[in-house]
Amino acid sequence: MRRALLLAALLACAPPAFADRLKDLTTVAGVRSNPLVGYGVVVGLSGTGDGNSQLTQQSMQSLISRLGLSVETGDLKAKNAAAVMVTADLPPFLKIGQTLDVTVSTVGQAKSLKGGTLLMTPLMGADGEVYAIAQGNLVVGGLGVEGKDGSSLTVNIPTVGRVPRGGMVEKMVETPFLETDHLVLNLNRGDFSTAAAVAEGVNRTFGPDVAVALDGTSIRVRAPADPARRVSFMSLLENVEVDPAPPVARVVVNARTGTVVIGGTVKVTPAAVTHGSLTVRVTEDQRVSQGASVVVGNNATVVAPGEPVVTPDSQVQVVEEPAKAFVFDPGVSLSSLVDAINAVGASPSDLVAILEALREAGALRAELVVI
């Protein structure tokens, strides 16, 4: 009897099959990264910079003047310098003095940033405030080489580089993590069934009425007010496992490449499909004939032979392949759908046409998304 009770308790506490952690399904409202951007100059390039770009020359003059030197714009040659935009993402809770990676991209005519050094660049947020300062040596994965005869060789993208840990935080971004008596979890993909499952899983772990689903995306969770307890609570909360609802039946079609992605929950109602293809071939040929000669006198003396005449000869041929027909039974599944279409040798473009026709006929029990 004791063994049976222990087994029942273990089964009750075991996570559901195919369960996902809340940290993989949701994000905490207000806890997010913030984009930063700045304009700067990269120096130390081996002749692959912007050249005589006025933008780069003005930037260099402004930078040098801030260092206490005076120089005319015309005296500056920017072959070894490049104007760049610097971008970064400021993660939540990053403190003053900590570092982050930055991405550097050219805005002028620079051929490559390889071997360059980014000079001190302020990084601003959307509010115009400076949150970080970036500086350091660039790591460039691409390669660009150009010869004097105009020939060139480019591998990957040499005009974009990174400065690992090249940005230093100068100002923190406040988050509402500790400002209220509750937390709000937002699903990465809104779904009412999944929102209800998340609330049920949290209440099963922490007790009744701790979580309530506000809508198909947000779940409100009561949390301790003490910061230390709230962090511990969050570490437990994000590891709660729930069984999300099956995704919406959806078929995604890329009409340009012929790529089709069909969800596992897609089904088709009874339908008969006939699909044939029409091929039109146009061939061009040239026919050459001798033009009329110039004849003089009663003796029909040929004074000048005729010029050759080129006449285009076009042939149009229409070939219609036999129509391919197949029938879908009620509630046919994904595998049966794919097998039936592949069995008749349908190409990706044929598959796109068949799916669109099934949707128009009301036989496709799924959302068709064309990208």
Curated annotation (Swiss-Prot):
Pfam families recorded: FlgI (PF02119)
Gene name linked to the record: flgI1
Bilayer-spanning residue ranges: none
A biological-process GO annotation: bacterial-type flagellum-dependent cell motility
GO molecular function list: structural molecule activity
Similarity comment: family membership: Belongs to the FlgI family.
Primary localization class, coarse: periplasm
This protein's record includes keyword Signal: yes
Name under which the protein is recorded: Flagellar P-ring protein 1
Job of this protein: Assembles around the rod to form the L-ring and probably protects the motor/basal body from shearing forces during rotation.
Keyword Signal in annotation: yes
Protein source organism: Cereibacter sphaeroides (strain ATCC 17023 / DSM 158 / JCM 6121 / CCUG 31486 / LMG 2827 / NBRC 12203 / NCIMB 8253 / ATH 2.4.1.)
InterPro entries noted in UniProt: Flag_FlgI
GO CC annotations on file: bacterial-type flagellum basal body, distal rod, P ring; outer membrane-bounded periplasmic space
Compartments, record wording: Periplasm; Bacterial flagellum basal body
